[in-house]
Amino acid sequence: MTTSKTNGTTAAVDPFDDPVTSNKMAIRALIPLLITFVLGTLCLQGFNLVFQQVGTDVGAPNQASLITAFPSIVLGIVCFIYGSLGDFVSLRRLVTVGLVTLFVGSIFGFVANYFFAANLWTVIIARVLQTAGEQVAGSAFLVVATKYLRNDLKVIFFGLFTAAYQLSASIGVFAAGILSSIAWQFLFLIPSVTILFLPILLKTLPSKSGNGQKVDALGFVIFGFATAFLTLFFSYMAWWMLVVSVVLYVAFGVYINKAANPFITPAFFRNTRWLRAISLILVFYFV
């Protein structure tokens, strides 16, 4: 935030109100956000590879799938929610909370399982914190690129985002293979270095707090539980979980039609392009 003088008075000027300045600020923010997303995804892919070994080491081989199931549930929920939270909470605050959560999860996971007896639930808690934290970077990257970049740069940065995801997924498998032969606990530390980006992001991310409306907490809760049960259904194929998920999604549909300011409006689901894209994804997934 800068200041300008007009008729003897000093007024605050938001650099993101100027297209040229906002483009420069966005580029400076996007690089650390992309690196954070890459390191977080790398850690995610690494644990997806070694979760059976981790389950055996913590004495719970039959529950090893929970190490990937719970973070997957969190990922499915936050991917949708973080984008909507940008309408209520400033990106600066959202990313700050995300990086701190990622750092806490990384340090907690390493210390609790390397210096003390490794435990299934300390692994799960740490991975949930890491997943929730790192996904903030991915969501913030897409929001910043969409809102503040010049049109000719948007395609470039969206391409970088896709390429970075594929690269991190590949390197994650490689890193897991190396670190698992030493100590899988070191996987927790991979994204911890991203806390160093916080000072840069505090200077380059917008501090506007959206439209001033209150966060739609009830809507987030209903949608979150519906998504959680749907994810659990695909992990355990328990039909009652699918039934609960459907009931909650129906309740969510009723809620957003009656709520004054839902975090997502019914008009979103009437978007024909979105419906076609989702239909194609479902066809390719199930056929």
Where are these regions (language model features)?
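Cytosolic juxtamembrane N-terminal segment immediately preceding the first transmembrane helix
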Residues: 1-42, 53
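Helix-boundary and loop/linker segments of multi-pass membrane transporters
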Residues: 18-26, 112-117, 266-272
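12-transmembrane solute porter fold
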Residues: 26-43, 48, 68-70, 105, ...
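Membrane-interface helix caps of multi-pass secondary transporters
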Residues: 46-61, 145
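Short helix-loop-helix connector
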Residues: 55, 59, 133, 148-150, ...
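Helix-loop-helix hairpins in multi-pass membrane proteins, especially solute transporters
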Residues: 65-68, 72-75, 79-212
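Hydrophobic transmembrane-helix bundles of small-molecule transporters
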Residues: 182-279
